[in-house]
Each structure stands twice: as structure tokens, then as C-alpha cells.
Regions:
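Small-residue-biased structural context
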Residues: 2-167
Length: 167
């Protein structure tokens, strides 16, 4: 009975690497497509937040900034979780990411979490002008941070993951 259990376990582990490469490659492709979509939304977010920051009394700008932020927020957490698992967990285990880059990514993620918490504290940008201005400035900072994130991931991080797949 133990021999059968070992054989079954061994067979499962033999097949896993055959599935791992297409699965990781698929995740990288999916993240790249999401980054393309996110890039467009980042631009919209920066423009609408800039408009709101310049004129905090502009109700239309405030509403548009909220709408763009909501469209990003809906999938941002799951996207970041997938990246964390793929890059920090799998990439770390397979030495795909240089130590200094890994530290940079973790620092970026901590800064992003703080900023997202700040945005969450004033998501109702219908308040007074100073609250709308703080909301707009937080969204501007988030758009800058997300643009840097997308550029780094598409140019450096995801290609490193793909190289690790085939080395």
C-alpha cells in the first residue's frame, strides 16, 4: 500500500513541472494585458484628479475622478495579489528576481498600501473643498505610483519571470 501511495505521489510531482511553465507563462501574459488596460486608466485618473486638484469645487471633475478610481479599484487588489504570488513567492523561490529588485518591489507595495488606505479614508469626495483636494492629490500620487509600477513590471519584472521559466 505504501508503494502505491508513493507511486501516486511521485506521478503527481512528475507532472507538475509540465504544467508549471504554461501556467506561469499564462499568468505573465494576463498581467501584461491588464497592465495595458491599467495604463489607459492611469492616464484618465491623472487627468481627472489633476482637474479636481486645480478646482476642488468642480463637482463634475470630482465625480469623474471617483468613477475612474472605482473602475481601477474593482480589480486592483486581486491583480496585486496575483503579482505578489507570482513575483515575490514563485520568483523568489526560483531566483528570478534580484534581491535588490525584490526589496524595491516590497517597499513599493508598502507605499501603495498606505496610499490606498489614505484614499479609502476620503473616498467620498463630495465633502468640502479641502477634502476633495486631498482626495485629488492622493489620486495623483496613486496614478504616479501605478505608472511607475506598470513600467517596472512590464520592462523588468515580468521579463525576468519569463527568463526564469526557460532557464
Amino acid at each position: 500500500m505504501d508503494a502505491i501511495g508513493v507511486a501516486m505521489t511521485k506521478d503527481c510531482f512528475v507532472r507538475l513541472p509540465d504544467l508549471e511553465v504554461p501556467m506561469i507563462n499564462s499568468l505573465v501574459s494576463c498581467l501584461t494585458r491588464e497592465h495595458t488596460k491599467l495604463d489607459e486608466q492611469i492616464l484618465q485618473l491623472a487627468l481627472s484628479a489633476g482637474r479636481l486638484a486645480a478646482n476642488p469645487n468642480d463637482q463634475e471633475a470630482g465625480e469623474h475622478a471617483r468613477e475612474v478610481w472605482e473602475s481601477i479599484r474593482r480589480y486592483l487588489w486581486s491583480h496585486l495579489q496575483i503579482e505578489d504570488e507570482l513575483v515575490l513567492t514563485w520568483g523568489g523561490a526560483h531566483h528570478a528576481i534580484a534581491h535588490t529588485l525584490g526589496e524595491t518591489l516590497e517597499s513599493e507595495r508598502q507605499q501603495m498600501r498606505k496610499l490606498l488606505a489614505a484614499i479609502g479614508s476620503h473616498t467620498d469626495a463630495r465633502g468640502n473643498a479641502s477634502e476633495r483636494e486631498r482626495f485629488a492629490k492622493s489620486l495623483l500620487e496613486l496614478s504616479r505610483m501605478l505608472a511607475t509600477h506598470v513600467e517596472r513590471y512590464d520592462g523588468e519584472v515580468l521579463p525576468a519571470i519569463q527568463r526564469a521559466l526557460f532557464n
